[in-house]
Amino acid sequence: MIEIAALGKTYRSLFGSRTVPALDNVTLRVAPGEVVGVAGPNGAGKSTLISILLGFLKPTGGQARIAGQAPRAYVESRGASYLPELLPLPPRWTTETALRRHATLAGVPAEAVAARAQHMVEWLGLEEHRKKDVRQLSKGTLQRLGLAQALIGDSDLVVLDEPTHGLDPLWTQRFRDIVRELRRPARCILIASHDLAELERLADRVAILHQGRLERVVSAGVAAADEEPAVYRISVTGAAEMIARIFPSATPVEGRANEWRLRGRVPELNRGLSELIAAGAVVVAFAPESSRLESEFRAAVEGR
């Protein structure tokens, strides 16, 4: 669905004396039905790549095509579900107003706007916030509103920039479920994030950018779920009995209260985590103890 070939983008320096490369000869293909993560240090080119794919910027070299069209033409004709890293909204808009306005902008028929907004309110757990002004929302709730706005148009191109930023562990886990629900054969999902652990759990592949170059593309947790088991650490407040019941092979981490080491395949661990949260446990942290993606990321950035 997405075809990127030798893509380049340069900017003029502040005083115009030299050019600064933001993207350098990037080639990548994203198939329909695929979830691809985009990772890289600050300044690696992630935002520039997203801006080109959404038609906000034009490349200075190479090309990008989405379903055979130039990005701007695709977005104008078929739309895109986009969550920006920063969500600009009038502070006096209510949650419901923001959703309805965005539904209209996304091309939802007028007669379907109310029902679509209600669906997103229920899906993203915004019922108690629907009449609140945006300025009254917590950071995590505002992020959920951003997700609701991004997904209300139901596009086949989904681009999410730091989607779990500000979410608590409960909604971070719920977001994983949402991504699984979003998958469909014709849809392409791009997730840009600094959170390598989340990308490893969510994506089929992760593209690692560094200084504008695509250093490598790594198979992630979803695609590698049938490979050797992963080792995760979980920190939970006052839930030792639940841990023992849901993860019988869990072992306490020496010297760390309320922290356990889990071993298993990623889908199995995710199911156990969902069960733990549903049982009322307060999950403080859940992350891989050792990550192949993290190793690949470090090697790419360090030039190994």
Descriptions of predicted regions:
Residues 62-78:
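Conserved ABC transporter NBD signature motif
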Residues 158-162:
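Catalytic Walker B motif of ABC-type/P-loop ATPase nucleotide-binding domains
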Residues 1-4, 9-25:
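A short, flexible loop at the N-terminus of ABC-type nucleotide-binding domains that lies
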Residues 36-41:
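The feature captures the beta-strand-to-loop junction immediately N-terminal to the Walker
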Residues 176-263:
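ABC transporter nucleotide-binding domain
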